């Protein structure tokens, strides 16, 4: 069985696949290496053989996790690496190694699914947008703070803004002007993300008219999915690209 990991800034997304058919056996999201090991050990009748992962962590943090996986499960680990070109997609950064690996894999996955021009929007700790033309040319992209960063900055630097995650979730049941601080903050941040999406769609149309696909991924994808009804929400888009970048026989 194959373990796949997407090690982000705040969480580790994991899933276990059956090696022969690629069928999904189990999946989850954890906030630490220890929690990952606990989750995997709790699975019944699961025998891990190989692992492929993508990480935006520091090299030391990634190596610690790899060492832990080898120690606990005795499996080989393959890491996604930067590339100038792969699977028909040409990296658009001047220094290709500086492009975040999660963005790169999401682009590979999006282009593979689109079979043509596409806009890839990822809503995690940070929000990213990337434009890939029909011939696979990465035209560049944008990065801005995601919902967690905007929320935490306001909580940290504004003394009177204090509320919990449950209050934040309740506040997002509407987009009407807030009648209290939590509603005002959460809905204001949400509207910023929605405005970001609309700007990206406008730019994509200026490039390709209506001849392109839109993919939305990331933990907060559902907050903006209604802004782009034509978009396809693909929660595992990074994993689609990971399988392309790190094929395991």
Curated annotation (Swiss-Prot):
* UniProt key word Cell wall biogenesis/degradation: no
- One GO molecular-function annotation for this sequence? metal ion binding
Q: State the pathway, as annotated in the record.
A: Cofactor biosynthesis; coenzyme A biosynthesis; CoA from (R)-pantothenate: step 1/5
Reactions listed under catalytic activity: (R)-pantothenate + ATP = (R)-4'-phosphopantothenate + ADP + H(+)
Q: Which UniProt keywords apply?
A: ATP-binding, Coenzyme A biosynthesis, Cytoplasm, Kinase, Metal-binding, Nucleotide-binding, Potassium, Transferase
BP-aspect Gene Ontology terms? coenzyme A biosynthetic process
Look up the EC number in the record and give it.
2.7.1.33
Grouped into one coarse class, the protein's main location is cytoplasm
Gene Ontology annotations for the cellular component aspect, listed alphabetically? cytoplasm
Q: Which residues form the active site?
A: 102 (proton acceptor)
The UniProt record gives the binding positions of ATP as: 6-13, 125
Name the cofactor(s) required for activity, per the record: NH4(+); K(+)
This protein's assembly is summarised as: Homodimer.
The family line of this record is: Belongs to the type III pantothenate kinase family.
Recorded hits in NCBIfam families, A to Z, give: baf, PRK13322.1-2, PRK13322.1-4
Tell me the protein's name.
Answer: Type III pantothenate kinase
**What organism does this protein naturally occur in?**
Pseudomonas fluorescens (strain Pf0-1)
């Amino acid at each position: 069985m194959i373990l796949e990991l997407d090690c982000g800034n705040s969480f580790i997304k994991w899933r276990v696949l059956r090696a022969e058919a690629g069928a999904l056996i189990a999946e989850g999201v954890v906030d630490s290496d220890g929690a990952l090991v606990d989750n995997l050990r709790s699975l019944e009748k699961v025998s891990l053989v190989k692992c492929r992962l993508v990480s935006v962590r520091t090299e030391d943090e990634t190596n610690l996790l790899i060492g832990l996986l080898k120690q606990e499960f005795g499996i080989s680990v393959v890491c996604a690496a930067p590339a100038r070109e792969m699977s028909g997609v040409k990296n658009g950064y001047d220094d290709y190694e500086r492009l975040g690996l999660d963005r790169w894999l999401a682009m590979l996955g999006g282009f593979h699914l689109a079979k043509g021009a596409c806009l890839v929007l990822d809503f995690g700790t940070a929000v990213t947008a990337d434009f890939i033309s029909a011939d696979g040319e990465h035209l560049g992209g944008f990065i801005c703070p995601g919902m967690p960063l905007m929320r935490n900055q306001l909580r940290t630097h504004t003394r009177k803004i204090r509320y919990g995650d449950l209050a934040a979730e309740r506040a997002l049941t509407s987009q009407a002007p807030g009648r209290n601080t939590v509603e005002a903050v959460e809905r204001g941040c949400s509207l910023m993300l929605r405005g970001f999406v609309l700007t990206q769609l406008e730019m994509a149309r200026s490039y390709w008219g209506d001849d392109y696909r839109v993919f939305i991924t990331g933990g907060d994808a559902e907050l903006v999915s209604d802004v782009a009804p034509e978009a396809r929400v693909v929660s595992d888009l990074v994993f689609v690209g990971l399988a392309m970048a790190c094929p395991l026989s």
